[in-house]
UniProtKB/Swiss-Prot annotation:
The lineage of its organism: Eukaryota, Metazoa, Chordata, Craniata, Vertebrata. The active site is at C54 (nucleophile), C57 (nucleophile), C398 (nucleophile), C401 (nucleophile). This is Protein disulfide-isomerase. It catalyses: Catalyzes the rearrangement of -S-S- bonds in proteins. Belongs to the protein disulfide isomerase family. It comes from Oryctolagus cuniculus. Keywords: Cell membrane, Chaperone, Disulfide bond, Endoplasmic reticulum, Isomerase, Membrane, Phosphoprotein, Redox-active center, Repeat, Signal. Disulfide bonds join C54-C57, C398-C401.
Amino acid sequence: MLRRAVLCLALAVTAGWAWAAEEEDNVLVLKSSNFAEELAAHKHLLVEFYAPWCGHCKALAPEYAKAAGKLKAEGSDIRLAKVDATEESDLAQQYGVRGYPTIKFFKNGDTASPKEYTAGREADDIVNWLKKRTGPAATTLADSAAAESLVESSEVAVIGFFKDVESDAAKQFLLAAEATDDIPFGLTASSDVFSRYQVHQDGVVLFKKFDEGRNNFEGEVTKEKLLDFIKHNQLPLVIEFTEQTAPKIFGGEIKTHILLFLPRSAADHDGKLSGFKQAAEGFKGKILFIFIDSDHADNQRILEFFGLKKEECPAVRLITLEEEMTKYKPESDELTAEGITEFCQRFLEGKIKPHLMSQELPEDWDRQPVKVLVGKNFEEVAFDEKKNVFVEFYAPWCGHCKQLAPIWDKLGETYKEHQDIVIAKMDSTANEVEAVKVHSFPTLKFFPAGPGRTVIDYNGERTLDGFKKFLESGGQDGAGDEDGLEDLEEAEEPDLEEDDDQKAVRDEL
């Protein structure tokens, strides 16, 4: 009897061990077998669904672990966890994982509606976002030690100094705090804290570990004005584009970005960056100044997007990220503070024309059944009033474009003797035209003969028969909206798209 009891106890303990989550660098490792138990055990749980091959996941890993360690050291009840979605496909499907990394926040074990994590990829961003979701919008600062701890805890922190924390201004401050995900806010009425930071009347101060160190808010305290003040001052004058900073860059409200492509190894690196920073001072809140290390392998796609080669750097380009992306190029290659300032000012005044990339026209562009278009000959060919022109806009790296290539070649062969039908293709990563905005690959458009510069989208089957029916119907059978096209970012190796936030970055760059 005793032996049976001991055996049962051993089995129970072993089973308990089997269900318990392991930890890696303070991050819980979750599986289907322990997911529900860990949700029940932790009131606040942030879960990353990742893939071992995902570059963005690898870049996030040290910051994610750092955030987990920081919260654990503070004695917080917030825990961080991760799930290998390639191994735990049922969990990934259950929680709608369509890209890597996908990060979801579970509160009180609620599996019905976990909140999507949308902030930055640095440890401070993660910690601040979680604290905003689990505590007050602003921490009450009773003394200087508490204030110093808050300021030291993050790259950027905001403190409201109000002698009456129930005042209308203080309430507006709290509304701004509630609307800001990724920055810690503190609220104080302590004369000790006022004195420590040399604040002599009610006000708001943004503290930061870069540039001028602090910014004092001036004017009437309203939620909208505070948010505008924070937007203008929370980022460095010049911010480097990295995996970690990308969400801050593209998640902000400033949609005009000027980019300095500069090799970190350049002899005049510091001087060029200093001039760029000097120019940035006059455009805070209007234009975001971004430095891109043109030597870094991860940034080569961005160079390609702007039609740049490494040997052409340093170089400056400007882009607007509204509904339609538009690029601009300085007339001069001189990268002085004065030259960059003048370029930005002329852009804001509407005096700069968009820059459209074009390859050189190949000598044999029209010798094959499928004609080769570049920016320089597009208008002449596509809008020839005597021709019906069917164009594939492709990217060399796009898997679906590669699959389409032999079919498109057969289509060219089929119509090579037709005098009024032209089958063509254009590499849209190296050529841009004002008449067509390409948002996905492959994009197929038909330019029928006749006046009026008509453009018809093709959204039918990507088969030879489908294309023939479309052409023989005069662009009717298969015409439609572009809702079936592949994403610009399109990952070729994985079954799932990579991380939505990073996809947006590449969509916009």
